[in-house]
Amino acid sequence: MADLQKIVDDLSSLTVLEAAELAKLLEEKWGVSAAAAVAVAAAPGAAAGGAPAEEKTEFQVVLAAAGDKKIEVIKEVRAITGLGLKEAKDLVEGAPKPLKEGVAKDEAEKIKAALEKAGAKVELK
């Protein structure tokens, strides 16, 4: 039992970067992926629910890619978010990035349509 407590104490003292490195090393050693484990753990609860899923009311608008017409996309991002030119340009060039969060479905669809018309690739999550 003392060995387990020492392991807990050692793990608790790790920095975030050290913990991430440890996770990566364990994934390589054991031949697993932490993302796959989360997906597998979430799947049984979703499948066993049986009740109809509630319709999502809030969406996140994610700029997936700027496309060929970057200037038009930057203009549209500025109009939607109210960001300055530099901030909008950085957001567009850093895609994929969330553009707006907690948006109603109809507003999210309007934003998506406007950005796609400007040449961007957009995802609603």
UniProtKB/Swiss-Prot annotation:
Superkingdom in the source lineage: Bacteria
Subunit structure: Homodimer. Part of the ribosomal stalk of the 50S ribosomal subunit. Forms a multimeric L10(L12)X complex, where L10 forms an elongated spine to which 2 to 4 L12 dimers bind in a sequential fashion. Binds GTP-bound translation factors.
Gene Ontology CC terms, in alphabetical order: cytosolic large ribosomal subunit
Keyword Isomerase: no
Protein name according to UniProt: Large ribosomal subunit protein bL12
Molecular function (Gene Ontology), one example: structural constituent of ribosome
Sequence similarity: Belongs to the bacterial ribosomal protein bL12 family.
Function: Forms part of the ribosomal stalk which helps the ribosome interact with GTP-bound translation factors. Is thus essential for accurate translation.
Coiled-coil features, chain-numbered ranges: none
Keyword set includes Ribosomal protein: yes
GO BP terms: translation
Keywords: Ribonucleoprotein, Ribosomal protein
Species: Afipia carboxidovorans (strain ATCC 49405 / DSM 1227 / KCTC 32145 / OM5)
